[in-house]
């Protein structure tokens, strides 16, 4: 059902790796997903993947303050930074040498739009078609794509001040999981009153690593951008026996949530970013 749609999405859905190194020397990486929108390198992804970067900026200010105090008359009375303070941070945007510029993060909506610098349009053969939001209906078959289940070791080269991550073939490790559209969720508007907080709810959860990835229909048109997973209690409490002891279990249903493509298209239109829209006969939609 989704074979053709997945073949298209594999071209423009790419992994982003968020790597950090803390004061105690611990190096970790997490994976998310982004969607390349056009040949100019504009992308959309989830906003929360930048939380580590915000924390890094905060930690850097604190570390610099402590450094200044250590160099002052207080000297030895100044404590070291917290062991989990982030001292190095880096994003890897699907290709070496590529960095994100002109990024705008709508954290309350949980979306980010930005432009990849040093992007080569030849890297992506097919760009996404952003669906007509009026055609996203309850019960519609959908499929979510991203990069869960990736576990690898990241090193940090102290001399170069750079992270080293293993090579990956995104075409081989991308993972789809299917679902249906269950509901449209309206959470009102953002605090500044400028952005609609509208989402598409899905019958299966988004997995870690799929944040920022596309939720597509059977034709491959993007219906939403995956941002979160919510758990609902089923109010079933079966009693099970574990090692001779009776335990009451709570059962939950995990569902996914994606930013409605209607909102994404509106944000792109406001910034004059071109994209292919469902039903456009002329190809790319040019906003001047």
Predicted regions located by residue number:
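Terminal peptide-recognition signature
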Residues: 16, 34, 41, 45, ...
